[in-house]
Design a protein with these regions (language model features):
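Short amphipathic alpha-helical interaction/hinge segments
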Residues: 22, 26, 84, 118-121
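C-terminal regulatory/oligomerization modules of transcriptional regulators
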Residues: 101-125
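Charged, amphipathic alpha-helical coiled-coil/dimerization segments
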Residues: 26, 48-108
């Protein structure tokens, strides 16, 4: 899916998490681990590979020399945006294959699921 942008799926996961964070498109590795559901060792390796490709930059957090921040580079922003656009276009093509009735039925089903999730989250048991 992301090959046209020269990205693997895991690269898209990290870049899109940073892009979603808003300006300055910067998160801690811990935040990225929570966003992408990988181990700290996996994230360290991924960040190194992305840094070698100049898609992200790591720097020490101001005021805390132990903390690291990861920021999208200009090239990282460009690639993330291109990949997100490609994903949205692919999703639109899939949705365009549905009839109006199928789209309505899918929307109704998804609303039902969301209500179930909301009830599940509200249940303290």
């Amino acid at each position: 899916m992301f090959a046209e942008q020269g990205l693997d799926g895991w690269e898209f996961d990290v870049l899109s998490a940073l892009r979603r964070s808003g300006e300055p498109f910067e998160l801690t590795p811990r935040d990225l681990i929570q966003e992408t559901f990988v181990t700290s060792g996996t994230m360290t390796t991924r960040l190194h590979k992305l840094e070698v490709r100049h898609l992200v930059r790591r720097r020490r957090a101001e005021g805390d020399g132990r903390s690291v921040l990861v920021r999208l580079s200009e090239e990282g922003i460009r690639l993330a945006d291109a990949a997100i656009l490609a994903l949205v276009e692919a999703e639109q093509k899939l949705l365009d294959s549905l009839t109006e009735e199928q789209t309505t039925d899918m929307g109704d089903g998804l609303r039902c699921l969301l209500r179930s999730f909301a009830q599940f989250d509200a249940d303290p048991r």
